[in-house]
């Protein structure tokens, strides 16, 4: 059966209810020692089971000390959860009885373990990811007119421990603008020298921050939706777009998501990722992210100099990852490489060879392909990004360029999901 067969996506084994969302992309730092970080986050659908994903990108162990979570019916002050009547919602203690393992709720051991030690990573570009236990917590209907469901997560890092957190200092402020975030709220607050987890009321003089405690969340959705997982470099991340996050994956996912069919985005595009980094990270996280559709970059400008060997390797890795996604129950989509500045004529030929392989594969009916090259190229040789789509560095698109890329990939994702 071809991936182009519309019935394929309806028969995929993964069409279950687990969704995965990642909130920050790219950067990591040490959590504030003896401090509490609290986050207000949104997900696409109602949930009744939820767990947190934590990561470690360093050569030393990382310790998650103590975490609580709670649903909230509205943003309130960003740190104190409320129900629809305006009354306080009790926090739930997050446990790690399964020692970070990826297990179903029924296989989770009983107990009261509230900390997790994450082993050292062998490669900073492929962090170790581990899970909290599944927590039986139900989302709340919004009381403020919002459509998405809101979650608050709070983590305390003790003096004796170390913990790694994703962060984005330049992102969170513009991400507060509704026109930018499209309702996908990410807010962060910190209070130093206080444990606001063991005693939540102690978290009473917080200030805005830029760290997000969990790397990602997974939840059992109530609606037959989808997780869109994407893998690539800074172009996949959306670098040089609004808030550096409004790239084609975000635009595509949010345009396709609806209450009847929520689409949750898991973006693994990172700045500076080489082909080897993209490959290693995808190998580690394709199955973990529980995808329904998985998009893979087939080339990156970070592999320098471009050669026939790098072109062949990039392509072979992409098709291997596509098959890995298929085995995991997802429909794979390959992304053709866009033009960028600095390539010689010979190097441009290598890039175009990957474009042509992807188009040939799509024409044969064996693979879905989103041809981003055709949307952004000026048609020259060597090609460049069309001026109206160039952010100014000759490599990354601007917002109009990312919108053009989203216009290409969105119908392909729609086809994969049979929407």
Regions found by a protein language model. Give the residues of each.
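Beta-sheet-rich sandwich/jelly-roll-like modules and their strand-loop junctions
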Residues: 4-62, 193-195, 200-220
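Serine-esterase "nucleophile elbow" of acetyl-processing enzymes
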Residues: 7-17, 183-184, 189, 193-269, ...
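Short, surface-exposed beta-strand/strand-loop-strand elements in extracellular ectodomains
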Residues: 62-75
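Oxyanion-hole/transition-state-stabilizing segment in secreted/luminal serine hydrolases
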Residues: 237-240, 248, 275-316, 337-340
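Catalytic His-Asp segment of secreted/periplasmic serine-dependent ester chemistry enzymes
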Residues: 339-419
